[in-house]
């Protein structure tokens, strides 16, 4: 019996209604911001100030023009860090300050917080 490989089949085409240029532009901009954050995180990792990105706490300066696309984004989730604070400034380029997160590590979500998660349940997981 001859089997045809899944790798030889064609993918279904997405309906044109799935194309959302505004959403695409938003995520392209968010990825640019995340890349700046990742560079800052990697500098701290290279200098051995932090181990993983979850040991990092970010302060992100963004131009006010980016408020519309980023106000509903949790940058700690996007950048996989323990915390992230966003500050909007007039005519500002994207700048990131990375510091070592303070507090204790949750055994459930692995984030480092000053308000330690209960070891049995984690507020991050109940949201």
Please state what every model-predicted region is.
Residues 73-107:
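C-terminal edge-of-domain segments
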Residues 41, 110:
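Histidine-centered, metal-coordinating catalytic motifs and their short helical/loop contexts
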Residues 55-79:
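Extended, charged helical/alpha-beta scaffold domains that provide interaction surfaces
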Residues 84, 120-121, 125:
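Terminal, compositionally biased segments used for targeting/anchoring and flexible tails
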Residues 111-117, 127:
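Short functional micro-motifs and their immediate structural scaffolds
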Residues 1-40, 47-64, 89-97, 116:
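Acidic, turn-prone loop/beta-hairpin segments
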Residues 106-109, 119-122:
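Short cysteine-rich clusters marking metal-coordination/redox-active sites
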